[in-house]
Structure formats: C-alpha cells, structure tokens
C-alpha cells in the first residue's frame, strides 16, 4: 500500500537523523497548523504572534521529552562530543529556520523589531537548553515529565531578558554534564 498521509509532505525536507522532529510533526500536526495560522494573525496584531511564538517553541521542545533507545544512540558510532555537537548544530538550525516566519513579522511591526529579535534568540537559547537537558539526564527509552516541567518553567523565565543570560550560563554547565552522561553510552567509540 502506498497511501500517503497529509503530514508526509511536510516530513520530506526533514532528514531521517532528525527523528525527534519527524515524530513530533506526526503527533502534533494540528497544533503546528494552529501555530502557523496564529503567526499569520500576527500580521494584524503583534501580541497574537508572540503567543503563537511561545506556543510553537514549547511545542517543538516537547519533541525532545522522550528518550530514544540506546541502540539508536549507539548506531551513530560517534564520540559523545561529536554526537552532541552535531545534534545541537543541526537541530538548532532547523528550529531557527522554523522560526523565520515569526521574524518576518518584525518587518511589518518594525517598532517591535528589538523585541522580536530578542524573543528569537531567547527561543534558540531555550531550545539548546532543552536538548542539553535531554542528554544530561538521558536514560534509554524513558519519558521525563519532570524535565518537561523544568523546561517549561525555564522557558517562561527566559522570556524575560535578564534571565536569558542565566539560561545561557546554565547551557555551558549542562553541555559538560551531558558529555559526561553520554560517555557511559559511547564508551566503545572513544
């Protein structure tokens, strides 16, 4: 059977290595469409775009709450630092591209361009925080509700500009904690 679902069209540009995105798009396709329409509503009112932006950021972060099996992690045959660097660069790049329609609203509401760019970089910072939290507390085949609460709380705090710096500093510490934790799963590839 070669039945094609509607979301399959959206999955074609997403590489197989970004399985979190593929799974998340499949599970949240209606919510993603809602975010898209709300962002388009931001053309008329900037506050609607901000609400859609926050909702979209938290929705994409939910893609990273479930940990992959250990064999998927080991199939990459990379060192922990190379694995984590590739994951951060690729996935943050895709997230940055997904947020570009929101940044286009800054051209329409040009008086809010500083807030728009600040929110954009705060979201990227929070996204890196979410990925690093996943691998800092990685256990194969688990789902973390505690991690989702922490990410949501930090996400709301990082919207306030002074707290974005704290999240950035926390990312530095989480990076080394994630490397240390992943080292137990990649011991054969060092």
Residues of each region from the PLM?
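Hydrophobic alpha-helical transmembrane segments of membrane proteins
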Residues: 1-70, 84-190
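Short helix-to-coil transition segments within interhelical loops
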Residues: 74-80
